[in-house]
C-alpha cells in the first residue's frame, strides 16, 4: 500500500505573495494573504532556496505528445507524489487513509480552503461533482478513473464539512495513487477531479436553473450540456 506521509516542514508565521496580489490588497480589492489561506495551508519543502517572483520559467519537453507539460506546475489533486516519485504527500486533503481492506478511503480536507472568488471550498463541492456531474450520464457517460474499480463504481459520501469518504465495492488499495493523478490541469477535463465549485456551476444545470437552455443559446451552444462542458 502506498502511504500518504506528512511532510515535515516548519509552518511559516507570515506569508508572501506576488507583487500584483499585494497591490490588490493595498487597494482594498483583495483580503490580506493570511485571510485567504486555510488554517493549515500546505507548505512544500524548499529545494535549494526560496524562489523569487518574476523571471522566466523554462520547461523541458519530452516531444510532441508532451502537450500537458506546461500544466504540471499548476496541477491540483487530492494528494500528490513527493519529489522521490514514490511516496504520496498531502495536497487538497491533509490526510487520506484507507480502512483495513482498502474499500473505504477517508479524506480530511484543509479547514478554511477557498475558491479563487473567496467562496468556501468544502465537502459540498465534492458531493455536487459526484451527484450532479459524474453520476449525470448526459455530462459524464464515461466515469472518471478515480471512481472506477473493475466493472464497479465507487461512491462519494459527505461525513462533515471537511471530511469525505470514497466507498468502493471491493479492495482498492491503488486509490491514493490514482487520486494523485486526478486533476483538471490538462485540457480542462473538469470531470476528472472529485470536486467542482458548486456555488458557481449550479447555474449551468437544469436541476438548479430552469432558464439554462436560454443561457446556452445566448452563449452560442446547442444545449446546456455543451455550455457546462
Regions found by a protein language model. Give the residues of each.
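Intrinsically disordered, low-complexity Ser/Thr/Pro-rich tracts
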Residues: 1-26, 33, 39
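Solvent-exposed, acidic/flexible segments
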Residues: 11-18, 30, 67-72, 85-89, ...
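N-terminal lobe/hinge region of extracytoplasmic solute-binding protein
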Residues: 23-26, 31-101, 131
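N-terminal short leaders/motifs
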Residues: 41-63, 107-120, 199-219
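Aromatic- and charge-enriched surface segment that lines or borders ligand/interaction sites
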Residues: 95-140, 159, 165-167, 175
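Surface-exposed binding/hinge segments that line
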Residues: 145-229
Amino acid at each position: 500500500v502506498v502511504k500518504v506521509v506528512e511532510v515535515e516542514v516548519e509552518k511559516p508565521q507570515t506569508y508572501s505573495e506576488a507583487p500584483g496580489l499585494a497591490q490588490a490588497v493595498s487597494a482594498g480589492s483583495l483580503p490580506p494573504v493570511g485571510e485567504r489561506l486555510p488554517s493549515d495551508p500546505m507548505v512544500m519543502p524548499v529545494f535549494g532556496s526560496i524562489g523569487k517572483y518574476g523571471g522566466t520559467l523554462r520547461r523541458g519537453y519530452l516531444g510532441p505528445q508532451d502537450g500537458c507539460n506546461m500544466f504540471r506546475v499548476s496541477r491540483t489533486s487530492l494528494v500528490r507524489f513527493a519529489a522521490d516519485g514514490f511516496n504520496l504527500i498531502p495536497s487538497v486533503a491533509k490526510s487520506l487513509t484507507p480502512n483495513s481492506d482498502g474499500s473505504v478511503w477517508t479524506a480530511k480536507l484543509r479547514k478554511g480552503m477557498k475558491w479563487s472568488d473567496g467562496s468556501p471550498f468544502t465537502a459540498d463541492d465534492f458531493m455536487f461533482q459526484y451527484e450532479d456531474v459524474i453520476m449525470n450520464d448526459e455530462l459524464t457517460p464515461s466515469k472518471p478513473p478515480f471512481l472506477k474499480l473493475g466493472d464497479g463504481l465507487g461512491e462519494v459520501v459527505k461525513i462533515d464539512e471537511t471530511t469525505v469518504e470514497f466507498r468502493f465495492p471491493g479492495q482498492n488499495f491503488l486509490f491514493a495513487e490514482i487520486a494523485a493523478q486526478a486533476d483538471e490541469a490538462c485540457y480542462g477535463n473538469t470531470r476528472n477531479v472529485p470536486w467542482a465549485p458548486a456555488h458557481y456551476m449550479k447555474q449551468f444545470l437544469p436541476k438548479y436553473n430552469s432558464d439554462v437552455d436560454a443561457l446556452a443559446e445566448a452563449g452560442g451552444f446547442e444545449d446546456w450540456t455543451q455550455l457546462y462542458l
